Amino acid sequence: MKRYNVIFLLDPAGNRLLMCRRRKEPYQGLLNLVGGKIKDGEDHLCAAYRELSEETGIAERDVKLTRLMDFTYYQPDCLLEVYAGQLCRDVPVQGDENDLLWISIDEDFFDANRFAGDGNIGHIQVIAQYRAEHWRLAGTL
């Protein structure tokens, strides 16, 4: 089974989500979360930080990532791990593989004409908002 990760990353204010515009298939031209492949034998959290750094220039010291959820796809036999985090301070981002942009967290991420993943980013947003509210109410944030 192939393994991948994506990172649901908010700016310090929690108002904007970091996305990339895909330059290649699948979902060429659509907005997607940053992420990539998990190497064989690689610690999964380390892989998320590595991909974040490679694709955006954001260092581990700038954000604490938490594994939020997974998607298992039986065709084409892959696992997609979803990590979430919020930058602790403003940092510059730069992407070599894809163009990066910050967009409002209030977008309709279920819009398959704009966003990759056939609605999965919308599901990720709903779960991330629920978890954040739950953690606030529990006093763990």
Label every PLM stretch briefly.
Residues 1-17, 34:
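Conserved N-terminal beta-strand and adjoining loop/helix that marks the start
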Residues 26, 30-31, 94-141:
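Nudix hydrolase/Nudix homology domain
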